[in-house]
């Protein structure tokens, strides 16, 4: 019983939010899939910088679900931002109360951007507070670490691309 409780501590909390285009996303329904959850905001400059990397992950790995969870933006702001910055993955929004609860449930999101990778078992396997940038990888190794965790979680080689 104690072991089951410890195992369940690593499971990610459930939430349901909508994307600006009206599609609903529920974490429980995504169990069995690999999810990259990115907490961010339109006013956050480092968040904007990592959009090409997140677009790349979204387009390269068919079985990876990339979700941008805005901590403060409205549906209209996300729609405009998505078009302006050519964001390829879903951008989710909620009330400040919903976002605060999700942030705390996920261990406290104290900086944006923060990326969390969730494996097929619904467990966090990677978390990083800061921008995941390919250009900084030679100094911080974050991009390559996340890429390795994605391919491990998906059970694919790095070259596995969407057709």
Task: Label every model-predicted segment.
Residues 1-14, 80:
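N-proximal helix/coil linker or "cap" segments that precede and/or mark the start of modular domains
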Residues 14-35:
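A short beta-strand-turn-helix
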Residues 30-33, 63, 87-88:
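Active-site acidic short loop of glycosyltransferases
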Residues 31-32, 39-56:
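Conserved redox-active cysteine motifs that mediate thiol-disulfide chemistry
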Residues 36-37, 66, 115:
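Hydrophobic beta-strand anchors of alpha/beta hydrolase catalytic cores
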Residues 48-86, 96-103:
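Structural microenvironment flanking redox-active thiols in thiol-disulfide oxidoreductases
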Residues 84-87, 94-149:
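Thiol/disulfide oxidoreductase modules built on the thioredoxin-like
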Residues 149-163:
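Non-globular targeting/processing and membrane-anchoring segments
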């Amino acid at each position: 019983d104690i072991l089951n409780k410890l195992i369940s501590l690593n499971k990610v909390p459930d939430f349901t939010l909508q994307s600006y285009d009206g599609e609903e996303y529920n974490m429980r329904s995504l169990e069995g899939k690999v999810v990259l959850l990115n907490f961010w905001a339109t006013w956050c400059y480092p968040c904007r910088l990592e959009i090409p990397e997140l677009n790349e992950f979204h387009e390269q790995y068919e079985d990876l679900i990339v979700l941008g969870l805005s901590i403060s933006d409205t549906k209209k702001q996300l729609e405009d931002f998505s078009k302006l910055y050519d964001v390829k993955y879903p951008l989710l929004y909620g009330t400040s109360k919903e976002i605060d609860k999700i942030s705390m449930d996920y261990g406290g999101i104290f900086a944006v951007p923060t990326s969390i990778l969730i494996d097929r078992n619904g467990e966090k396997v990677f978390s990083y507070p800061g921008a995941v940038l390919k250009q900084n990888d030679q100094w911080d190794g974050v991009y390559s670490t996340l890429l390795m965790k994605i391919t491990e979680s998906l059970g694919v080689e790095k070259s596995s691309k969407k057709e």
